[in-house]
UniProtKB/Swiss-Prot annotation:
Pathway: Amino-acid biosynthesis; L-threonine biosynthesis; L-threonine from L-aspartate: step 4/5. Coiled coil: none annotated. The gene is thrB. Keywords: Amino-acid biosynthesis, ATP-binding, Kinase, Nucleotide-binding, Threonine biosynthesis, Transferase. Belongs to the pseudomonas-type ThrB family. This is Homoserine kinase. HAMAP family: Homoser_kinase_2 (MF_00301). NCBIfam families: PRK05231.1 (NF003558), thrB_alt (TIGR00938).
Length: 320
């Protein structure tokens, strides 16, 4: 979450009037974390909300898909924030020239250093979402799939990546060739979250209270979602592999939705694809963010290390 578009108290008060029983505005607080949209914590005399203004990286035409997705998951009693409907039944409005939604506020906070039990709970929740999404009929193309990794790598420049870390660009080129040959495109597909990092999961203690930020959700190889989550949760901030977290994540997932034998057999390839996807998007930001920018780009070398780790790993060493 972040703040790019400013709004006044008067604008927010008028916006709240569009919604029944929304209450009288008491406070507005910008949420500075994240990079995609502008987000505010809105407090009224009735309840709290998240006000989201969608910035240029989000296609307004895709917002109904995201609303339908979170509505579906929330209707199945999963802790996902749904968008409130205005008096005329609309979830998407306009505020300060941007598409905007008033979104349910969930209790809890994210943790930068999740423990093994929190990781297990996240795996269990991901499995519950995957089970629910077996009967969700809408689709959205993955704009960051293998085809687009090639495009992104070319735009970044292989030599530019070599400047970030020795041999990074050379190894990315080889990895793309490998994934072209071995990507398991025939595995079961569904809508996936595609960005289930610790900052998108809310906890009170070890109790999981919410899953947020579905704006990368898309239709893709389902087990790749678990591979992304694995890559985000099973390494510490110094990029050391956390075997106890890995076992906990897989255990939690299997408590609610088991991998097939084919998914299990392909999991290392999926992990390599997960590492490459985030290496490339971070490399792009690293190369293209001006030195004086207020936003500090995330380091692509973290996922370069994970990619190298996965190349040498076995399923047994990964917690299976």
């Amino acid at each position: 979450m972040a703040v790019y578009t400013s709004v006044s108290d008067e604008e927010v008060s008028s916006f709240l009037d569009l919604y029944p029983d929304s209450g009288r505005l008491l406070s507005i607080k910008g949420i500075t974390e994240g990079v995609e949209n502008s987000n505010y914590l809105i407090t009224t005399d009735v309840r709290s909300y998240i006000l989201t203004l969608y910035e240029k990286r989000v296609n307004p035409e895709e917002l109904p898909f995201f609303m339908a997705l979170t509505d579906h998951l929330a209707a199945e009693n999963l802790p996902v924030p749904k968008a409130w409907k205005s008096r005329d039944g609309k979830q998407i409005q306009t505020l300060a020239g941007r598409p905007a939604c008033l979104i349910e506020f969930l209790q809890g906070r994210w943790t930068p250093t999740p423990n093994a039990e929190q990781t297990r709970a996240t795996g269990e929740m991901l499995g519950k979402m995957h089970k629910s999404l077996t009967h969700f009929s809408e689709n959205r193309k993955n704009s960051l799939d293998l085809e687009n990794w090639h495009i992104l790598a070319e735009k970044c420049g292989f030599e530019a990546m070599n400047q970030i870390e020795a041999h990074m660009g050379d190894e990315v080129k080889k990895e793309l060739d490998y994934l072209d040959k071995f990507w398991p495109k025939d595995l079961p597909r569904s809508v996936i979250h595609a960005d289930l990092f610790p900052d998108n999961v809310l906890f009170e203690g070890d109790s999981l209270k919410g899953v947020i930020d579905f704006y990368f959700a898309c239709t893709e190889v389902r087990a790749w979602d678990l591979a992304i989550t694995y890559s985000a949760w099973c390494f510490d901030q110094e990029d050391h592999f956390l075997a106890d977290h890995a076992k906990a994540l897989i255990k939690g997932y299997h408590q609610s939705f088991a991998l097939t034998e084919e998914e299990r057999a392909a999991f290392i390839v999926l992990l390599r694809g997960a590492a490459l996807r985030f290496l490339l998007t971070r490399a792009w930001d690293w190369v293209n963010t001006p030195p004086d920018a207020l936003v500090v780009p995330k380091d692509p070398r973290d996922f370069f290390k994970r990619l190298r780790f996965y190349r040498e790993a076995s399923l047994e060493s990964l917690g299976f």
